[in-house]
Amino acid sequence: DIKYSRIWQIAYPIILGSIAQNLINITDTAFLGRVGEIALGAGALGGLFYLAVIMLGLGFSTGAQIIIARRNGEGKPKEIGQIIDQSLYFILPMAILTFLLLRYWSVFILDFAVKSENIFIETSIYLKYRSYGIFFAMGNMVFRAFYVGLAKTKVITYTTLVLAIVNISLDYILIFGKFGAPEMG
């Protein structure tokens, strides 16, 4: 017997995590907007490009999440471990390929899509730095699938809140060059 309260217990941590993720996006926009139009445009364009690439991992992890939830419902925890192992084995080559795409091949796509030379240069630089995060992002997707599949979504809220705090702090430090860090704009 499923009740709305049980669904809410599972859903609200995911909702809070999504709010924290959007807070990161708003903060990125606010900080880059203070730097200038080119930085803001490069961040927005690079962010969309990154999002399009990361969707590959999200699609895969959603499939893993469904299978994990099924095995959890069937009471087969050992099989859940095998699913996680296989997911990590699959996601690593995917992360390597998407890293290469972001780091080295994105300039060819951007050259075709971006008219402004300044935005092209800044977006290329942004994606080169951002490309290193793909490994963490895709690994995180597997573990997110694990916790959602087990209906233990509060873990996602805590990790996303930590992510938001770290991201906003590093944005401030690195964009504006605070505490001795280089100003990266």
Predicted regions and their residues:
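Short alpha-helical transmembrane segments in multi-pass integral membrane proteins
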Residues: 1-11, 68-135, 166, 179-184
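Residue-level recognition of transmembrane alpha-helices
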Residues: 11, 18, 44-47, 91, ...
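Helix-loop interface residues and adjacent transmembrane-helix termini in multi-pass membrane transporters
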Residues: 11, 23-26, 34-37, 71-74, ...
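Residue-level signal for short hydrophobic patches within transmembrane helices
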Residues: 4-23, 27, 49-56, 132, ...
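Hydrophobic/aromatic residues within transmembrane alpha-helices of membrane transport systems
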Residues: 16, 28-32, 43, 68-73, ...
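Interfacial/gating helices of multi-pass transporter permease domains
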Residues: 32-51, 117-122
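Cytoplasmic helix-loop-helix junction between adjacent transmembrane helices
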Residues: 115-116, 120-123, 127, 134-161
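Small-residue-rich hydrophobic transmembrane alpha-helices
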Residues: 40-100, 137-156
